[in-house]
């Protein structure tokens, strides 16, 4: 009943859905012989919003961007690394195209295998940023795991199933969405086999973890506790199929270049061999000649190498690339610090010579793009401490001496600026 008569002969209107009277709610909207309150409308909107991601995931999330569009988006955030970006764009495009094909395919259709990706490159070259940018663009659940924290089941440390649990948490335990997500496993080179010879002690954080990752990467049903953990022993685990999860593994693989050089040099012996000095070739150039056998010799087990067919090497970043990273990307460091100072009503100017000095310092530290923030932070820390209490500061100027000699940045005051 939408209407009920009270003792005072006046009509009271009630929500048809929850039964609350017009006096208990803010608004009651009338339809043909029905009424709905504002609270029920809000609840309906929440239900529709919650169901939308699952529907989009099942449908393949609308239009799939082409490899060129994926690369163009990566260009906004990652400087250089053209070949890895192209390789990643094609691999990701083919992966999600494969999922669409799988949804529509009949029993007699050709099955398309999954191509997981291995990124090799020095620290600070953009491996993690590439994976994060991809996941953000495709609007799929993304999780980043550190291989160094993983151990075999039964030992202190994280089990490999914890990776899938984190993926579920990132999409609020929506199983359908999680099964189409992206997992980035960093520092994969740190779990390499410790030696070729079998040892009496167990290698619980090396080869043991690689064995545990095998099935997860290839595709298996992983058992994950439900949200909030199991409340009682009879509560079922969530079953997650990892077949359609794209795994991207990354690592610096320090020392792998020596393995590659030993193999390539061994092929040319005697008077006919071409002699090329090691100093003439950069690490990234050597990595271009990588073969699966090199990874196996490094300590990655053959089964795991076979499950990562797409291997791409990131180049070392030079001075020019580091200067571009400081200024050009969407979230460039200079833009970030300019925004921070703009909140104090102060403009930030970093001169070209200072940018080059920052790049040179990062190169000397051998930390890649990751070292840029600490250098810039170090040069501005004193100024950022004083600025909130300083009056009439219009501009902060960072020049070469600020970076190289540790001098304080130049402060331009409003009165001086007007006179100039």
Swiss-Prot record:
Zn(2+) binds at residues 15, 18, 37, 40. One of its GO terms (biological process) is proteolysis involved in protein catabolic process. ATP binds at residues 122-129. It comes from the Bacteria. Component of the ClpX-ClpP complex. Forms a hexameric ring that, in the presence of ATP, binds to fourteen ClpP subunits assembled into a disk-like structure with a central cavity, resembling the structure of eukaryotic proteasomes. Belongs to the ClpX chaperone family. HAMAP family: ClpX. This is ATP-dependent Clp protease ATP-binding subunit ClpX.
């Amino acid at each position: 009943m939408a209407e009920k008569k009270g003792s005072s002969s006046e009509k009271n209107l009630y929500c048809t859905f929850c039964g609350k009277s017009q006096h208990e709610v803010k608004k009651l909207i009338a339809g043909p012989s029905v009424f709905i309150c504002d609270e029920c409308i809000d609840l309906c909107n929440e239900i529709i919003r919650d169901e939308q991601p699952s529907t989009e995931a099942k449908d393949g999330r609308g239009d799939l961007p082409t490899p060129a569009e994926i690369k163009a988006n990566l260009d906004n955030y990652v400087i250089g690394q053209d070949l890895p970006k192209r390789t990643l764009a094609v691999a990701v495009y083919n992966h999600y195209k494969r999922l669409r094909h799988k949804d529509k395919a009949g029993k007699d259709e050709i099955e398309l295998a999954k191509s997981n990706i291995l990124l090799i490159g020095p620290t600070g070259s953009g491996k993690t940023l590439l994976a994060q940018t991809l996941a953000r663009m495709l609007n799929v659940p993304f999780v980043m795991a550190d291989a160094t924290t993983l151990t075999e089941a039964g030992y202190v440390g994280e089990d490999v199933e914890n990776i899938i649990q984190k993926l579920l948490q990132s999409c609020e335990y929506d199983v359908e969405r999680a099964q189409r997500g992206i997992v980035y496993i960093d520092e994969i080179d740190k779990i390499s086999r410790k030696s070729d010879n079998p040892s009496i002690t167990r290698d619980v954080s090396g080869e043991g973890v690689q064995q545990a990752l095998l099935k997860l990467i290839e595709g298996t049903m992983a058992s994950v506790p439900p949200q909030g953990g199991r409340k009682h022993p009879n509560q079922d685990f969530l079953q997650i199929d990892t077949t359609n999860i794209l795994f991207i593994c990354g690592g610096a693989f320090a020392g792998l270049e020596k393995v590659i050089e030993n193999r390539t040099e061994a092929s040319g012996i005697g008077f006919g061999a071409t002699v090329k000095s090691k100093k003439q070739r950069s690490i990234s150039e050597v990595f271009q000649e990588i073969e699966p056998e090199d990874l196996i010799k490094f300590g990655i087990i053959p089964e795991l190498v076979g499950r990562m067919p797409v291997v791409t090497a990131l180049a070392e970043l030079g001075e020019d690339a580091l200067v571009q990273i400081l200024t050009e990307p969407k979230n460039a460091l200079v833009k970030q610090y300019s925004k921070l100072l703009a909140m104090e009503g102060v403009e930030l100017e970093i001169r070209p010579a200072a940018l080059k000095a920052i790049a040179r310092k990062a190169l000397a530290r051998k930390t890649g793009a990751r070292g840029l923030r600490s250098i810039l932070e170090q040069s501005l820390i004193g100024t950022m401490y004083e600025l909130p209490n300083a009056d009439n500061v219009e501009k902060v100027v960072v020049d070469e001496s600020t970076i190289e000699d540790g001098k304080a940045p130049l402060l331009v005051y409003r009165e001086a600026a007007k006179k100039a």
